[in-house]
Swiss-Prot record:
One of its GO terms (molecular function) is rRNA binding. InterPro entries: Ribosomal_bL9, Ribosomal_bL9/RNase_H1_N, Ribosomal_bL9_bac/chp, Ribosomal_bL9_C, Ribosomal_bL9_C_sf, Ribosomal_bL9_N, Ribosomal_bL9_N_sf. Disulfide bonds: none annotated. Belongs to the bacterial ribosomal protein bL9 family. Binds to the 23S rRNA. This is Large ribosomal subunit protein bL9. It comes from the Bacteria. GO terms for cellular component: ribonucleoprotein complex; ribosome.
Length: 149
């Protein structure tokens, strides 16, 4: 199924790109989320009429993400206190929700879906560099320190 993208989508394309996707992906994700429309002559003409508005909206979202990234890079360190054993092994783990809550408490609102932990949850005391993915083009790193209570 050929669709016109109304938003930048990772691993698929940018605003205004005409791409071929599977029907289920279009029907179940792209169309309900408002991220794409079917590639017909009428929709193509309507998109070209709205192109400037959509590009301005996309630029505003990018600027907001860059502003949040600047706030996050201003944070020197985020500390999370949790229960740990004698050797520094945590009772439990520190995951994306814990990190997002700690960063939000430090003054910058972050959703748990924006916190990226490719190596999995943190299970020991120490300092970690955590990637925060704010936009498809904006990533920043936050230093998180896990300490024992």
């Amino acid at each position: 199924m050929e669709v016109i993208l109304l938003d930048k989508i990772a691993h698929l394309g940018d605003l205004g790109d005409k791409v071929v996707v599977k029907s289920g992906f279009a029907r179940n994700y792209l169309f309900p989320q408002g991220k794409a429309v079917m590639a017909t002559k009428d929709n193509l003409a309507a998109f070209e009429a709205r192109r400037a508005e959509l590009e301005a909206k996309l630029a505003d979202v990018l600027a907001a993400a860059e502003a949040r990234a600047a706030q996050l890079s201003a944070l020197t360190n985020v500390t999370i206190a949790t229960k740990a054993g004698d050797e520094g092994k945590l009772f439990g783990s520190v995951g994306t929700r814990d990190i997002a809550d700690a960063i939000t408490a430090a003054g910058v609102p972050v959703a748990k879906s924006e916190v990226r932990m490719p190596n999995g949850v943190l299970r020991s005391v120490g300092e970690y560099d955590i990637v925060v993915h704010l936009h498809t083009d904006v990533n920043t790193t936050v230093k998180v320190t896990v300490v024992a209570e």
